[in-house]
Amino acid sequence: MEKREAFIQAVSKELVEEFLQFLQLDKDSSNPFSLSELLDELSRKQKEELWQRLKDLLTETLLESPVDRWQTVEVEGADDMESEHSPKMRKSIKIICAIVTVILASVSIINEHENYGALLECAVILNGILYALPESEQKLQNSIQDLCVKWWERGLPAKEDMGKTAFIMLLRRSLETKSGADVCRLWRIHQALYCFDYDWEESREIKDMLLECFINVNYIKKEEGRRFLSFLFSWNVDFIKMIHETIKNQLAGLQKSLMVHIAEIYFRAWKKASGKMLETIEYDCIQDFMFHGIHLLRRSPVHSKVREVLSYFHQQKVRQGVEEMLYRLYKPILWRGLKARNSEVRSNAALLFVEAFPIRDPNFTATEMDNEIQKQFEELYNLIEDPYPRVRSTGILGVCKISSKYWEMMPPNILVDFLKKVTGELAFDISSADVRCSVFKCLPIILDNKLSHPLLEQLLPTLRYSLHDNSEKVRVAFVDLLLKIKAVRAAKFWKICPMEDILVRLEMDSRPVSRRLVSLIFNSFLPVNQPEEVWCERCVTLIQMNRAAARRFYQYAHEHTASTNIAKLIHVIRHCLNACIQRTLREGSEAHKECEKENASVLDKTLSVNDTASMAGLLEIIVILWKNIHRSLENNKEAKIYTINKFAAVLPEYLKVFKDERCKIPLFMLMSFLPASAVPVFSCGVISVLRNQESVTGRSYCTLLDCLCSWGQVGHVLELIVDWLPTVPPQAKSNLASKRKVEINDTCSVKPELALLYMEYLLTHPKNRECLLSVPQKKLNQLLKALEGSKAELESFLQSPSGNPLNFNKATALHAFGLYCRMSVHLQYKFCSEEKIHLSILDDTGSWLENKVLPLLEDQEEEYLKLRKDVYQQIIQTYLAVCKDVVMVGLGDPKFQMQLLQRSFGIMKTVKGFFYVSLLLGILKEIAGNTIIHKTDSDEKVTVLFDLVQEVFQKMLECIACIFRKQPEESLPLFHSVQTPLHEFITTIQSWHKDTAVHHAVLSTLIAAPVVEISHQLQKVSDIEELTSPQCLHDLPPFSRCLVGVIMKSSDVVRSFVDELKACVTSGDVEGIVCLTAVLHIILVINKGKHISAKVKEVATAVYRKLKTFMEITLEEDSLERFLYESSMRTLGEFLNP
């Protein structure tokens, strides 16, 4: 009793410290004092006295320290921490916090019979000061907000004002902090929204914040947030329209995964709405989504999101009222969309129709319902007969989904008609691979309904030849269908598509198809649940059916079973081979023959050592399987040692028995899997076999080189290669010195062709190249020096009148030069000690080309060049190809690239033809797309580099144009070979350097070339009456036709080209009637292409204005320019005003 009285008395100005002490004790969990318990124990009179004292203390505190001064004190306190007002303010805040704490606890115990007027006054005062509190007093703000929320929830007097305050504060805080707890608290007082009049000016801020909630992910993802958002639809009819516009405007930026939540918000709002609000949600929101779902372009980022929203409503058809609503809202737009002239509108409408089927009103009579469904079946049939492939594909999806879902309810004749149309006609639609693909992607939907299996079992065999479709995606879809048939046991897949056809496709098809085919037939040829002997029998059967298909099958087999099973199969095949060998050795013994007849297996009857194809096939399968589980064996040392020992024991015998070349290659590959010590006899003789080869008739040398590389003996091969390459003997220093020396002639034969083949193989395969480059640098330098001799040989050939090399023949010298260039790059990359790779050897080769080769070709007669054409062309191609690869992998710095571009000027100046153009365009493309250079080098260096890129491109087009002028017909097919690299270069410039100097320069060059050619053609016309405007690309001159054709491949390039064309016309870079007419011809052709730019008319307008300045020519006598002027103005008039 004394404590209650003491607490009440402490609520005063004089004993305020005791009051604060009580509140501190309440916070201390170790102290028995509890504020809530104390308040529960107070009598009615004590409560009223306490509340009156709280009001008095609050009033006195605020009078002594008004809230409006707190902001000023806070600002001053930042500059002067010793301000005398600051401690006073902090004390006042502490007292008010304590008062709010007691009031919050009191709200829970208020009884309606008690006089809580003083408490109400306190709440109103605190509500009034809330907005004036400084930002730093977050704790006090939160406490007053909690009071407002609690006051609203209790429904006490003045709850409207308290609720409005709490609503605004929580709404603002939830948007600022993005806290889920604030969203939940806001939902608790959501009814407070009705306290705000929608039309009041004060509600404008509320509207903005509420609309912001609809694009706030925190609200959309949280259940309470979605409830709150759907509730907002009930505030005002006009606000519904604002909500819908906000969501529509933000759809592009929202994740697709959020669309189901957005749809749920609309659906909840629709379920709870009535009257005018329901009508607004249906016709202004849901039907608006339907309209845009039909009319939006498929490539629009919003289209798929709109469809997600509509899909949610389609899925809710079982809910009361949804089906009727969908029928009513779709009726005025969907059927019209299905018959629209625009094919994309029809396609979009078809998607919605298929997803929403059946669209009906549950209130229909039975007759009305039957008529409506029949009408929709007819619409579905129209879809699969539509002339537009995408609509037909959607129709196929509809047929399959509807048939699967409503199989029992659909009339049998309609089902048969639909499926015959799909499997008998659309599966063989020659006009569209997408339609054929849709058939096989959608038929598995029907297979999910078991009732469809008997009918499909009759129809599907007609599709067997689809496995050989010329479109990969169709073949993939067809095999997926076979896998589905196998999974659901609808039919035997080999009755639909014979095993022979499957193996043929497995042999030749791409990885996506082959992997699926292996999955399809895996259990047939590797039945892991049967004895291991059966595995081997099936393996032999597969090899004998199709050896190449067997290789592909076992290449992917490890993806469908454990590595232990693959290892078992390897040893089962080894046992099989051993048994065949042993049976051959025992063939002379009659006793053994009788015994074998009794215990003969299937393999004993079908397999023999003399069956070379089967033996080679089994050995190949072992190699493939071993490669597949190589990593697993590395992790299982015991299994690896066991396998190595077993094969080390039998491989020498295999080499004796299997002498055919087809068997030798897999045997050598198996040897490479073993350490050299495991097969000492063979490993010691490999280098001798390679040395004794005279000519290369097969590929056995490749596997022998693999063996040496895997054994770490590549150094022996390197020595052999160097020995076989011819060397230029050093010049004698003096006659005296030569007399004192004894000459020893090395009789080792020189085999440069074979040496280069070995070298090519080592350098081409990554693992072997790694072994080669691990050899000491000194030996590699010797090899490089030997290869460098090819330069002297090639130079000699170009110089000598007879055209015969000294040591190499022509082909060998060129081969050696190519290997020299490639090897020099690998060596410098391997042994460079600095951060950057200095390609000095390749740079020296470029200098040699520039200073030695090209001068030999300058000013030479045609006959001289023709004799050496293949040599100098291949030298240049080899050098440019290696340089292109260097730039592509990022080894060439800007200095190297600039030197390369400078040398290209010399090449273009000296030689003629197209042979270097593709490579040079590739180099320009790689330089333009090398973003690393752009980031790491100075702007000045990059500017110089790209100036060179543009200059080289311009010079190259000039050279090509010159060739076209001299030999137009011969040049046309040659130019087609460079169209792809030209397109790649232009698109790279467009992608990486749009609106930069190099971009504008390249476009200007592309404009100048056709303008000059077309102008030249116009000026050469003898009969001006024959002049007509071009109707298509083929009406342009040859070079212009090729260039404009390349430009028209990309819509982005077309837009930039047209912009640059307009700039050239406007600035006067293109002037004169003839040149302006050439521009007109270009834009007429572009306007006929598939990427039509709206800016073409802007160019036409610019040309029209320029031509009007030449109006006085109509006063002159008839001339070419007057005719061109009049015809161009006439054409422009028709073009601009159709």
UniProtKB/Swiss-Prot annotation:
GO terms for cellular component: condensed nuclear chromosome; condensin complex; nuclear speck; nucleus. HEAT repeats lie at residues 459-497. InterPro entries: ARM-like (IPR011989), ARM-type_fold (IPR016024), Condensin2_G2 (IPR024741). It holds the Pfam family Condensin2nSMC. Expressed in spleen, lung and testis as well as in hematopoietic cell lines. GO terms for biological process: cell division; chromosome condensation; erythrocyte differentiation; inner cell mass cell proliferation; positive regulation of chromosome condensation; positive regulation of chromosome segregation; positive regulation of chromosome separation; transcription by RNA polymerase II. The keyword Cell division applies. The modification Phosphoserine is found at S30. Regulatory subunit of the condensin-2 complex, a complex which establishes mitotic chromosome architecture and is involved in physical rigidity of the chromatid axis. Is required for early embryonic development and is essential for viability and expansion of the inner cell mass (ICM) of the implanting blastocyst. Component of the condensin-2 complex, which contains the SMC2 and SMC4 heterodimer, and 3 non SMC subunits that probably regulate the complex: NCAPH2, NCAPD3 and NCAPG2. This is Condensin-2 complex subunit G2. It comes from Mus musculus (Mouse).
